[in-house]
């Protein structure tokens, strides 16, 4: 089985056996460089054909969430790498307008008030953003 990691805009694909990724990278998968992210801004990724997630940079913090709105199970973005409100102060679901705190993933407005986005573990080392196991 191969894992395909795809960056929405550049369509960069990383193919490898999941066990080899764990062994070769100590459980961490490189996503992108911190310097390549807009601040504040987001970037979407896909593992295989189904699992979507995104990362948000806010100052020197990087947070990640599964790209599924808890309201209807739809992806949050309406356009590649667009996950934030116009003012870039909240994560926005483009389907029904729910807004989420960047730091916690908690819905603070819209149809899923009080529910939270599913977080993913990330780490930043030497300016590299990685999925952490």
How would you describe each model-predicted region?
Residues 99-106:
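Short metal-binding segments enriched for Cys and/or His
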Residues 83-91, 107-115:
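Short cysteine/histidine-rich metal-coordination sites, predominantly Zn2+-binding motifs
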Residues 1-84, 102, 116-133:
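N-terminal pre-ligand scaffold of iron-sulfur
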Residues 46-47, 89, 93:
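Short linear sequence motifs
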């Amino acid at each position: 089985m191969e894992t395909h990691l795809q960056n929405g805009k550049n369509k960069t694909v990383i193919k490898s056996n999941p066990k080899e990724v764990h062994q070769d990278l100590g459980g961490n998968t490189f996503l992108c460089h911190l310097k390549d992210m807009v601040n504040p801004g987001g970037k979407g990724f896909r593992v295989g054909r189904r699992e979507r997630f995104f990362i948000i940079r806010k100052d020197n913090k990087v947070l990640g969430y599964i790209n599924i709105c808890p309201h209807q199970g739809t992806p949050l973005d309406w356009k590649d790498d667009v996950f934030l409100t116009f003012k870039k102060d909240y994560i926005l679901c483009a389907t029904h307008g729910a807004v989420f705190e960047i730091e916690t993933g908690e819905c603070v407005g819209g149809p899923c008030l009080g529910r939270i986005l599913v977080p993913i573990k990330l780490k930043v080392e030497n300016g590299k953003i990685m999925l952490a196991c």
